[in-house]
Amino acid sequence: MAEAGARRPFFRRRKSCPFTGANAPKIDYKDSKLLMRYVSERGKIVPSRITAVSAKKQRELARAIKRARFLGLLPYVIR
């Protein structure tokens, strides 16, 4: 039997991917405002375990960020 004061462990519900769904935004290298939400304050790409982006969309996002950096739309390093 379980103790009277024992609680069951808290499980955080998995967030759904912000790029899947009916009215989800498209990942585009020209949309620097959207891409900046997935870049840290130091300029690094934020991992999907923090942003809850699916693996496929994370690869698309990384490709778009790298393309935008190459074209000068996003900085490589933010000081």
UniProtKB/Swiss-Prot annotation:
Listed InterPro entries: Ribosomal_bS18 (IPR001648), Ribosomal_bS18_CS (IPR018275), Ribosomal_bS18_sf (IPR036870)
Keywords annotated in UniProt: Ribonucleoprotein, Ribosomal protein, RNA-binding, rRNA-binding
PROSITE patterns for the chain: RIBOSOMAL_S18
Zinc listed as a keyword: no
Signal sequence segment: none
A Gene Ontology BP annotation from the UniProt entry: translation
A Pfam family it matches: Ribosomal_S18
PANTHER family registered for this protein in UniProt: 30S RIBOSOMAL PROTEIN S18, SMALL RIBOSOMAL SUBUNIT PROTEIN BS18M
NCBIfam families: S18 (TIGR00165)
Protein purpose: Binds as a heterodimer with protein bS6 to the central domain of the 16S rRNA, where it helps stabilize the platform of the 30S subunit.
HAMAP family (alphabetical): Ribosomal_bS18 (MF_00270)
Subunit-level organization: Part of the 30S ribosomal subunit. Forms a tight heterodimer with protein bS6.
Full protein name: Small ribosomal subunit protein bS18
